[in-house]
Curated annotation (Swiss-Prot):
GO CC, one annotated term: plasma membrane
UniProt main location, coarse: membrane
Membrane topology summary: Peripheral membrane protein
Protein name: Protein TraC
Gene3D superfamilies linked: 1.10.8.730, P-loop containing nucleotide triphosphate hydrolases
Subcellular locations according to the entry: Cell inner membrane
Alphabetically ordered keywords of this record: Cell inner membrane, Cell membrane, Conjugation, Membrane, Plasmid
Pfam families with a match to the protein in the record: DUF5934, P-loop_TraG, TraC_F_IV
InterPro entries: F-pilin_assembly_TraC (IPR053155), P-loop_NTPase (IPR027417), P-loop_TraG (IPR043964), TraC-F-type (IPR014117), TraC/Conjuga_ATPase (IPR025955), TRAC_dom (IPR045978)
Disulfide bonds: none
Length: 875
């Protein structure tokens, strides 16, 4: 057995030895403390936001950020205003950044925008899910198109931001006041260029920059970020799962959201040299060409222009030295070897004069586009070619910054240029120089307008998610009326039917004048009343409640019925007005045209006009002309009914008037009776209720020579607005509306419609129209309209929308369920009717028709829903 004392001695010696050894744990902690882990948020200068001043307090700078409403187009006056801002308002030597962001996060906007075009009934949830999936899938990928048509048509939302910061370490009160004044000056200058702005606060800032930095290619919904007032802004802009890897030719960005990993590839391209020519109004064609839609950038991107206005004295001195050197060389043998030296000397001489007089300034600028796509080589190659080709079409040569993608990516973020990044760009030789007017033409400020927050989803030609709501009050429209013209197959009916459905779903009513059964299917599917013109029965006095308000309208109706060609004069109309009032006062709603004729007969035989042969002659003429509408007259059965065909409880009424076309006198009488009925119903219903009257084939229904018809239409179209009423008039050709050949009624409808939609036109007729009226359309508009295709061939309708002075180009895509609902094809109509007879509801019948006509598409939408819908509620 060992000695216990030896064991104790050994233990003590071990402890002493251990105490003499160096402290390895302390050394490890020291090494860990010295290690610097790479963290992207540390590169960002964002720190705090001053609520009182609206300024951002960064690490070494102080600045502001504005969101601007993109302008739909531009002209020379806007460019001159921007040039003036650069020359006279912007501090020298400090970067200003303009960011145009094409966002894929449109999920919320789609859902909100479709709320008035949603399905109702027992199948509403299932139907709305399919319709929503149709547009969501288009935003994630692109709209389905026929084989061979490879156009990048998707859904995006464009936003413009302007950021500026200047060095300020102490953030003194003087610096803050100076920056506040600069914000006011910049905003006023932009307003002078028709660019409306609003300031970006801290919450909006972390949402915007968070979207710029944390791109998830699988997400369609913006992430809800909660502002933490106790944390620096730079940490709140970067996701915890953010994983950025730098490659030679691109960056990869990894994120983890809702239990799923995503990886995006970030590509950058910057301007290689000054373009030979550039116009502000054409800048949007760089990312989406109107005439060549295949030259479009469909992936999300950020187009950034970073500019610095150089010191005027230094640039003027530089121009002087350059001019004197070149002017001297141009007078020596040097010019024989380099003939261009004379031209250069002249250009520098002109530049120094402009700089000396303050007419121009020299601006250094860097134009870069940052694109986001899925992380695979095939997709990245397509994106690269789309970007390079789109810009090259307009004379912009872009290059990829090999080994410098991180640098270029940082330039698309606010306030980064002011931290010293622009200096690095200059040292790298990628900054261009140009005069202020030329740089103003490069500003990424032009993009399409989303129009209204909700309505008919009709994306623009540049893929901007847009909605059309004719009852929206923010479009500077003076009324809610719409004029539509397009040849057969252009998609007129498919465009109007969703508008009708939205009015009905909102609780309003719609009346359609049709010639050709185009709305019969929709009427049946919506539970409306379908009436043939031959069965219509009227009474001009049936719906009158106030004779003082309605007497003149009834008089006008009877005047046109008596003389469709407008041969009655003021005396005729005065006598007729007396007859109308007397008939109403005697029998009220039971009055008939017979009572009007009886009054005229009694007046003709009375002693009052015994000595007035001219008046008696007029009375006799009206008696003869109105006799055909009395109870025993040719058309008496149409206008003397005790029970008129039209009842106020019908939400939708379609009137097929094709059978009356060969009887123009009867047709005009019926038209007037219908319009008066609709007017009276508008007046008698609450003003918050939407009312719609669609006049299809207006070129046939409004082709009357009587000027009274035009006045009648004009008055009705003008007064409808006060009662939330709208008239939609549809013709085959713009000549039917806006030409010397158009009837007064058609011209009145065109002139009193704030909304004008022009679809595909007959090529021959449209060319002839442009020769006769060369100022009606701009050359670009003629070329665009000339390229419109047939709706069935390209699976969408193309149209020009004009709202007062605003013009925009749109496409209308319709989901398979809506296509089935609106289809007027004979076999489709019979299919639905047969299913209804079998006991199916209208929605079940439409569902089966959609699967019958578009089975693969319906299957793909259901599969998409199954994969993505579970993440929708989380988002």
């Amino acid at each position: 057995m060992n000695n216990p004392l030896e064991a104790v001695t050994q233990a003590v010696n071990s402890l002493v030895t251990a105490l003499k050894l160096p402290d390895e744990s302390a050394k490890a902690n020291e090494v860990l403390g010295e290690m610097s882990f790479p963290q992207f948020s540390r590169l960002l200068p964002y720190r705090d936001y001053n609520q009182e001043s609206g300024l951002f307090m960064n690490d070494t700078t102080m600045g502001f950020m504005l969101e601007a409403i993109p302008i739909n187009g531009a002209n020379e006056s806007i460019v001159e205003a921007l040039d003036h801002m650069l020359r006279t308002k912007l501090p020298r030597g400090i970067p200003l950044c303009i960011h145009l962001m094409s966002s894929q996060l449109v999920g919320d906007r789609i859902e909100y925008g479709l709320r008035e075009f949603s399905w109702s009934g027992e199948q509403a949830e299932r139907f709305n899910a399919i319709t929503r999936a149709y547009y969501m899938k288009a935003a994630a990928t692109q709209f389905p198109l026929p084989e061979g048509m490879n156009l990048p048509l998707t859904l995006r939302h464009y936003r413009v931001f302007i950021s500026y910061c200047s060095p300020s370490k102490k953030k003194s009160r003087a610096d803050i006041l100076e920056m506040e004044n600069l914000v006011k000056i910049i905003r006023a200058s932009l307003q002078g260029a028709s660019i409306t702005t609003q300031t970006v606060d801290a919450q909006a800032f972390i949402d915007i920059v968070g979207e710029m930095i944390n791109h998830n290619p699988d997400s369609l919904y913006p992430k809800r970020r909660q502002l933490d007032p106790y944390s620096d802004l730079n940490y709140q802009c970067v996701e915890d799962s953010f994983d950025l890897k730098v490659r030679a030719d691109y960056l990869t960005l990894g994120l983890r959201e809702n239990g799923r990993n995503s990886t995006a590839r970030i590509l950058n391209f910057h301007l290689a040299r000054n373009p030979e020519i550039a116009f502000l109004w054409n800048m949007a064609d760089n990312y989406s060409n109107l005439l060549n839609p295949e030259l479009s950038i469909s992936c999300p991107f950020i187009l950034t222009l970073t500019l610095v206005v150089e010191d005027q004295v230094k640039t003027h001195s530089e121009a002087n030295l350059k001019y004197m050197d070149l002017e001297k060389k141009s007078k020596t043998s040097y010019a024989k070897w380099f003939p261009s030296v004379e031209k250069e000397a002249k250009e520098w001489g002109e530049l120094r004069q402009r700089l000396g007089s303050g007419q121009s300034s020299v601006v250094s600028y860097f134009l870069n586009i940052t694109a986001f796509c899925k992380d695979n080589n095939e997709t990245a190659l397509e994106v690269e070619q789309d970007i390079l080709n789109s810009f090259r079409k307009n004379g912009f040569e872009l290059i990829s910054p090999r080994f410098n993608h991180m640098r270029n990516f940082l330039t698309c973020l606010p306030f980064m240029a002011g931290k010293g990044l622009f200096k690095q760009l200059k040292e790298a030789g990628v900054v261009q120089r140009a005069e202020s007017f030329n740089v103003a033409n490069l500003m990424p400020l032009v993009a399409d307008n989303p129009l209204t927050p909700a309505g008919l989803l009709a994306p623009t030609y540049r893929n901007q998610l847009a909605f059309i709501d004719i009852f929206f009050r923010g479009m500077n429209n003076t009324n809610y009326n719409m004029a539509v013209c397009g040849t057969s197959g252009a998609g007129k009916t498919g465009l109007i039917q969703p508008l009708i459905r939205s009015v009905l779903d909102s609780g309003g009513f719609a009346v359609v004048f049709d010639m050709g059964d185009g709305y019969k299917s929709l009427c049946e599917n919506m539970g409306g009343v379908y009436l043939d013109g031959e069965t219509l029965r009227f009474n001009p006095f049936a719906n009158i409640t106030d004779i003082d308000q309605s007497a003149e309208r009834v008089r006008d109706q009877l005047s046109v019925m008596a003389s469709p060609n407008g041969n009655l004069d003021e005396v005729h109309e005065g006598l007729l007005l007396q007859a109308v009032r007397a008939s109403w006062l005697a029998k009220e709603n039971r009055a008939r045209i017979d009572d009007v004729v009886d009054f005229l007969k009694n007046a003709s035989d009375s002693e009052q006009y015994a000595e007035s042969p001219t008046i008696r002659s007029r009375l006799d003429e009206m008696i003869v002309l109105l006799d055909q509408y009395t109870a025993n007259g040719t058309y008496g059965q149409y206008f003397n009914s005790d029970e008129p065909s039209l009842r106020d409880d019908a939400k939708m009424v379609v009137l097929e008037l094709g059978g009356l076309e060969d009887r123009p006198s009867l047709l005009v009488a019926v038209m007037f009776s219908l319009i008066i009925y609709i007017e009276n119903r508008m007046y008698r219903t609450p003003r918050n209720l939407k009312k719609l009257n669609v006049i299809d084939e207006g070129w046939r229904l409004l082709d009357f020579k009587n000027h009274k018809v035009g006045e009648f239409i004009e008055k009705g179209y003008r007064t409808a607005r006060r009662h939330t009423g709208a008239y939609i008039t549809i013709t085959q050709n713009i000549v039917d509306f806006d030409s010397d050949k158009a009837s007064s009624a058609a011209r009145a409808a065109w002139g009193n419609s704030s909304y004008k939609i022009i679809l595909k036109q007959s090529a021959k007729e449209f060319a002839k129209y442009n020769q006769l009226y060369p100022d009606q359309f701009l050359p670009l508009q003629r070329d665009m309209i000339g390229k419109f295709g047939a709706a069935k061939d390209q699976w969408f309708s193309s149209f020009l929308l004009q709202v007062e002075n605003h013009s925009s180009w749109h496409r209308l895509f319709v989901d398979p369920l809506s296509r089935a609902m609106y289809s007027s094809d004979g076999p489709d109509f019979e299919f639905v009717q047969q299913k209804r007879k079998e006991g199916l509801s209208i929605h079940e019948a439409v569902w089966q028709l959609a699967w019958k006509k578009s089975g693969p598409e319906m299957a793909s939408l259901e599969a998409w829903l199954e994969e993505h819908e579970k993440y929708r509620s989380v988002a």
